[in-house]
């Protein structure tokens, strides 16, 4: 490719509305342009990178035994009604009617469509297992699209769906896909972690996320210092440290009219926050207990995913408002506590070990000091309610926990029969009876992978692609003063022809621009190998090679250049 024949839309300045580095660099490198909130045009440089990522995914999926198909973006509403997700999904699901007033959705995912397809196409257990995938556009009507393509409304996703006769067969394919994903993200050159994860709106019995480590990530990833344990913070078990100590002081009621929060309480009475307890009131799961108290240490954060798994807590978790609390308990939010509490309570493991702690007295303007379980109040049911923190023991008993930010780029699920049972997707079993198929699903956010790679691999000059395989061009030829030097032009043209013949993805910068502009643009878009051709160097029989990743510059004999590139460049 020649720059004179290419849409080379680089920007010198960073757009003001781009918050994260990947969004900034994708705009500056001419990869994307916004067309509406969360919607982007992909320009030639971006499309080249996107297609290269897709090809790596496609190659590894095919090696793993998956078969590529293509399903429509527009999906009939009745399939979503059949699975019950029409009501469950919420406003992220874009719904519309055609001219015949038939309801449709723009697909955020394709479980319903694939289940419908397979139940129509398969009839016998002999046709299973089967693993089908597509690389297709998705649409989720995000309330706040942000961070460029990291959280956009329209995006490209690889989604695969496997069908089985037994859970054991699903487990086998799940393990194959687990390894396929490892190969994909390793080939992409990403620093990633595989973590246990919540199944969320997709549902199912087990799932793993593939998280690219980056400070701009939206997820907290927990992992051990001494083992392979890793989990999304939503699922990481919080192990209580230490042992319960005996009471040392009598419980005392104190006036605290201006201490409605833990922070105010700690500041006014010079307390250690670790000695305080907070009481959160949430909606209950049944009419006999419409409100439930969740009791945590003052410095700990409620884990809503864990809490809503308790049978007394409504799912999804919802906090009671102040009026409900006042009507049921007779006290303002800032003065809630476990002593004389009139509703069922669940205590976090860490709180269960506390002694001589401080909490609201369930009387406005008052707190109790030196509360102790069993002596002052019966210990309620104990449950893991909190997020882990750095330094907690690893749940597997090996090492302590660290927490880093991550970008979720892949997610695999064991769906079981969630969709197949709801949609009556059966085949004839070995015994001749209808058999409900067991399912798995496996997703990769292709557009998000591009952004995640940039978040991990960049410098002050631009993008540094982690592998030649996904760079927009592998080699850039930068001839200095090409139109003033016949020798420079001739060598550049011949090198371009030779590399093209070898199948190298090469770009020749034949613009009438200053060398500094050409260097800056090639570094900005992340071309990993740059050949700089100057008249004086040619007279000495040399050209300059520059490596984008290391910044190293090397003078190479011009008659050895092709051999050098063959050794160091992946076509």
UniProtKB/Swiss-Prot annotation:
It comes from the Bacteria. GO terms for biological process: prolyl-tRNA aminoacylation. It is found in: Cytoplasm. CDD domains: ProRS-INS, ProRS_anticodon_short, ProRS_core_prok. One of its GO terms (cellular component) is cytosol. The keyword Cell membrane does not apply. It is an enzyme of class 6 (ligase). The keyword Zinc does not apply. It catalyses: tRNA(Pro) + L-proline + ATP = L-prolyl-tRNA(Pro) + AMP + diphosphate. Catalyzes the attachment of proline to tRNA(Pro) in a two-step reaction: proline is first activated by ATP to form Pro-AMP and then transferred to the acceptor end of tRNA(Pro). As ProRS can inadvertently accommodate and process non-cognate amino acids such as alanine and cysteine, to avoid such errors it has two additional distinct editing activities against alanine. One activity is designated as 'pretransfer' editing and involves the tRNA(Pro)-independent hydrolysis of activated Ala-AMP. Homodimer. Belongs to the class-II aminoacyl-tRNA synthetase family. ProS type 1 subfamily. This is Proline--tRNA ligase.
